[in-house]
């Protein structure tokens, strides 16, 4: 009985979706009205409400050769808002400059430490346990440990 109900449900489900697909088919007339040729061109046929946006578009246009800090008097940007925006941009660039570079070999160090098997440590020998601050416990190889020690010694 459950199989018959499942089959009936599937047939109703397919009938429901067939009816909806007809609305999405290409070629049927729609109620959408398209408006063409309203843009940022130099023609005088732009509507009156576009004048504010046109001034802003001239300011933001990628066609300008250089970005200057001069503001149009009829622009919809206010002077205080644009000044704050410029200051925010400077602060972001300063922040990016202050970030230290990521060491090149850092990702290699971490992948090696994940793949390395740990040897069982014996409790009888105190040498087998690395100290918590040792370079070996940080996942550094012998060669990177030697180069780090030599750099520290040369800086001191």
UniProtKB/Swiss-Prot annotation:
Q: Where is the CRIB domain?
A: 26-39
Q: Which domain of life is it from?
A: Eukaryota
Q: What are the Low complexity biased-composition ranges?
A: 121-142
Extract the signal peptide range. Answer: none
Q: Where is the composition biased (Basic residues)?
A: 109-120
Query: What functional role does this protein have?
Result: Functions as a downstream effector of Rho-related GTP binding proteins of the 'Rho of Plants' (ROPs) family. Participates in the propagation of ROP GTPase signals in specific cellular responses.
Q: What is this protein called?
A: CRIB domain-containing protein RIC11
Q: What is the lineage of its organism?
A: Eukaryota, Viridiplantae, Streptophyta, Embryophyta, Tracheophyta
């Amino acid at each position: 009985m459950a199989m018959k109900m499942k089959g009936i449900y599937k047939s109703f489900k397919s009938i429901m979706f067939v009816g909806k697909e007809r609305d999405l088919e290409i070629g049927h007339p729609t109620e959408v009205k398209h408006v063409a040729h309203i843009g940022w061109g130099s023609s005088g046929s732009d509507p009156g409400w576009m004048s504010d946006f046109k001034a802003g578009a001239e300011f933001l246009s990628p066609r300008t050769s250089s970005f200057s800090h001069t503001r149009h008097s009829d622009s919809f940007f206010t002077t205080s808002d644009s000044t704050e925006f410029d200051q925010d941009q400077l602060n972001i660039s300063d922040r990016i400059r202050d970030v230290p570079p990521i060491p090149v070999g850092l990702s290699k160090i971490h992948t090696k430490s994940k793949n390395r098997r740990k040897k069982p440590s014996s409790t009888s020998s105190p040498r087998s346990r690395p100290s918590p601050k040792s370079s070996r416990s940080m996942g550094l190889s012998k060669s990177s440990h030697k180069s780090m020690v030599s750099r520290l010694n040369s800086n001191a």
